[in-house]
């Protein structure tokens, strides 16, 4: 599910504020929390005031899905069953699954929602009023032998826009994974964040199979130079054919396209694929190196900065610390300490300190 987003000192014109308490206290600026829901609605609430009723602190609410919202429990897009997909996902609603992204410079928020007419739509909203500024833009594209086609029966709901959105250097990155044997390819769409004009699209397996970008809901990572990092799930690994399943991939946007600048694939990649263990079961984490986590509990630390030209295989600087996957899952990296790794999951939150090298 989408994670809540915190916004400090958000100024909302009093005339646009819904809640009575918020109307008094937020016109000159207040802390806020933004929620995106599976019903396709995005809410902004005042965070610094305990409400008498939940609507007291409501700043604004914007319904993205309109009449096309998926009421899976009522009708269901999968063979008329009431299940969302082949895995019998029976969420009563299916709308905004991924975490949106906020651009404080432009005072805007971008989000993606699924609609029951077999389409994903991208929106740009005003952070102060919630009004739709750009969009909806239908997500679609093709690369190599793969096509992301809206309005194709049974196709789009097999694509999951689970990974959070990334904003880097004015570009918006939207990643997908697939959960059907016929539609498992991963996708990474790139848009101009201000206009929502599509710039390019990349697939980890353009002429192969699988390689979804799931990352447990994490967004792709970006470094100061604008390089983008993703982790891919089970899939074909054939770098000569531009296939990067079960890999940590470093991408660079240049000349209007995403190119692979480097990658790491574990030596047991074939085993990972056969056992559905997914190198890409978490998002990559940047500090001095790149940290990736796989489903059964191994991590790899990579020297990403050593590879600035061409496609190159990263070296593993440290691997072998094993944590049971059922007890810990890497999702985020607390700041400002660049050497602390946080793990969360069904057991108590824990942290490991990494030694300098």
Where does each model-flagged region fall?
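Mobile, glycine-rich extracellular loop/lid and propeptide segments
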Residues: 1-290, 294-314, 319-321, 348-357
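Inter-blade linker and blade-boundary elements of WD-repeat/beta-propeller domains
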Residues: 325-343
